[in-house]
Every structure is written in structure tokens, then in C-alpha cells.
Amino acid sequence: MNTLANWKKFLLVAVIICFLVPIMTKAEIAEADTSSELIVSEAKNLLGYQYKYGGETPKEGFDPSGLIQYVFSKADIHLPRSVNDQYKIGTAVKPENLKPGDILFFKKEGSTGTVPTHDALYIGDGQMVHSTQSKGVIITNYKKSSYWSGTYIGARRIAADPATADVPVVQEAEKYIGVPYVFGGSTPSEGFDCSGLVQYVFQQALGIYLPRSAEQQWAVGEKVAPQNIKPGDVVYFSNTYKTGISHAGIYAGAGRFIQASRSEKVTISYLSEDYWKSKMTGIRRFDNLTIPKENPIVSEATLYVGEVPYKQGGVTPETGFDTAGFVQYVYQKAAGISLPRYATSQYNAGTKIEKADLKPGDIVFFQSTSLNPSIYIGNGQVVHVTLSNGVTITNMNTSTYWKDKYAGSIRVQ
């Protein structure tokens, strides 16, 4: 069963990647030459730095793939973290066609396979810069070394980062590359976790309000077949730090996704990486969650999201709102309808409707410690006032707190 599941995951990623063959223009080739010079220069500046298993910065030291990832990042080229994953990208280069800036790959001595365990940056004339356990970052002529020439398995040329797609969600996500990972974080100022990044980006780019957790987002999105993936879709992964849906990233095109990585920060990663390939579960699209702003009640209600705090007894944006005060104010302002002041009376002010018949602008009630009214805006979402967040949007079908507190709905006309 596990073998079948893993095979399905492999096919899922393979279908996505097979469409992605980059073609370079003359201008991009010129830019690539400049990038190679920068990468080689950066690598030479790191000569003498110590070896460190898992190291990827000058401060801590470098392992082989950490060094390669670091010097390429200085040219704004984002590489996977492991040797094996770096070997999967770029263009294969024959030994006679090597240029400075190419990456050389080596297998374990005595191995009969072609799995790379070490990589290095080619700098010309048979020489390479790499990080070794015995001497740290050094220059070695691999052609004159029986060890390195005997374990050489190939080279890759990675001239430039593939361009991220020119769609609002991807362009917005790209702004936050480098922002630290913070568990529970959902803004650039505090940092992001994976679902916090997805939620924030969709709100900023498209005005789409997603649930907070990855598993809740997965539940409300539109399922997308791998062959139909497009930039701006969200890719979900399972069994990372917990069982089930547990991680998400925004597909950026060219087989890459932007994510808040628990081990790094907001970064660009490749779906072809062994780790992500084994964890990938599926794809979701959220175009269907666009708020129907043409509805005057919905339009008015969403004006105050994130702008107005909770205030006991509050009935205006200037003072803040309590739960019923918010609903009363929106209906009066948007539709000229005078509702009673308190939730119990509001519940009796309209026509009772079934949950399945809800339309944007209807009033939905939840029973917590008291009766809480909210305004339905479509797609299972409501605008309401909470003590902690003020005016906010909640998906009433996936919220762990509100989904079991549904008490009824009315339509006021």
C-alpha cells in the first residue's frame, strides 16, 4: 500500500515537472555569464573557511552542497539544499564543454552507482572550489587527482533562476523571500509559518481570505489535477512535522514553489527534491473564494476586516464593534435596514433559512457563551466580530472553534 502511495506521489511530481523546459534568450545567456563570474568570485572569497556538516553560511562553515547553495544565492539563484537534489536540476554538461560556474558531482569511492555524494564549483583549468572534511574550503584540480577524477559522475550548468510567473499571488509571495520562519507567524513583521504565508499572500494579492491552517485550506480549495497546475495554485504536503496535511507552498512555475520552511525561512524550493516529492499530496486552487463585492452588504462588511477592533457596546467603526452592533451597523449603512440592537432580537427579525440555502448577505448565528451573529459572504465564509481579532473573516465549515457552534440563519429583505 505504501509503495502504491509513493508511486502516486512520484507520478504527481513527474507530471508537473515534465512540462517545464526552459529556453534561454541571448540576453539571458549574457546575464548567465555575469552570474557565473560572480559565483566563482564569491567561492574564491570563501577559501579557508571550515567544513561543517549541515553548514551553509560562512559563520558556521560549509558542507559541500551548503557551499554551492550559498555561492549561487549571491547571484539570486535558488538551489535545493542536498547534493542529490542539486544534481537533478540544470543542464547536463560534457567534460569538454565545462565552463567556470558549472557544478561538478562525485560519487562515493568504490560505489558502482551514480548517486552523487559530493559537489564542487568548477572555476576553470580543471580546478574546483569545494568543502572537504579534512581541509575545509579549498581549490583542487580534479583532473590531476586520481581520487576525484575516479569518482566524477557529471556536471550541471545552472545559469539563472527560472523567472517566477507574472501572476499576483506569485509576485506577492516573492516579496517575502528571506523573511524568517516563525511557528504561528502570519505577517512579515513577525515572520511566517507555511500556512500563515499562504493566507497572508492571498489576502494581500487577491483579497481572498483563507483559513489559517494548512489542513483547513486544503479542505476549502478546489482540487486541481497535476497536469492542470498553474502558477498561483497551492501545493500541499503530508506527514512533515505531524500526521496528515501539514505543509503548504505557492506554486511559482518551472517546478518550483515558494514556502516558509521550518528549517530555513521563506524560500524557493523545487518539487523535484526528494523530501518534497515524497511528501506531496495534492494541489488546491482558491479562485472560487473571491468575495462577491457586488453585494452591498458584503462590500460594506468587508471594509472593516482587520481595521476595527472589538469593543463591548460598540456600534460604530470609530468606537469599535461588538458582535450584534457590527451586524446592525452594516445593514443600516448598506441597505437602510434597521435591525434590533441585540442578537436574540435580530434572530427573530428575518425569515429562517436552511444552511444549505445561504446566500451572500444573509445573517448566520453561532451559539457560544452567547448568541453571535455574523454576515455570510459566500463559500462557507462569514464576517463577524471576535474578542481577539475584531472584525474578521472565518470559514464556518473548517474553523475548529466555530464549525460546531452553528445555531441558525435568517434572510432580511
Curated annotation (Swiss-Prot):
Catalytic site positions: 194 (nucleophile), 247 (proton acceptor), 259
Enzyme Commission code(s) on record: 3.4.19.-
Activity regulation remarks: Inhibited by pretreatment with 1 mM 4-(hydroxymercuri)benzoate, a sulfhydryl inhibitor.
Signal peptide as annotated in the record: 1-32
Induction statement: In stationary phase; under control of SigD.
Outcome when changing residue 354 to K: In strain: IFO 16449
UniProt entry keywords in alphabetical sequence: Cell wall, Hydrolase, Protease, Secreted, Signal, Thiol protease
Gene Ontology CC, one term: extracellular region
Cellular compartments annotated: Secreted; Secreted, Cell wall
Gene Ontology MF term list: cysteine-type peptidase activity; endopeptidase activity
Enzyme class, broadest EC rank: hydrolase
Annotated thermal dependence: Optimum temperature is 45 degrees Celsius.
pH dependence of function: Optimum pH is 5.0.
Gene Ontology annotations of biological process type: peptidoglycan metabolic process; proteolysis
Stored InterPro entries: NLP_P60_dom (IPR000064), Papain-like_cys_pep_sf (IPR038765), Peptidase_C40 (IPR051202)
Domain annotation NlpC/P60: ranges: 33-159, 163-287, 291-413
PROSITE patterns (UniProt xref): NLPC_P60
Function: Cleaves, in an endo-type manner, the gamma-glutamyl bond between D-glutamate and L-glutamate of poly-gamma-glutamate (PGA).
Protein family according to the UniProt entry: Belongs to the peptidase C40 family.
Descriptive protein name: Gamma-DL-glutamyl hydrolase
Species this protein is from: Bacillus subtilis (strain 168)
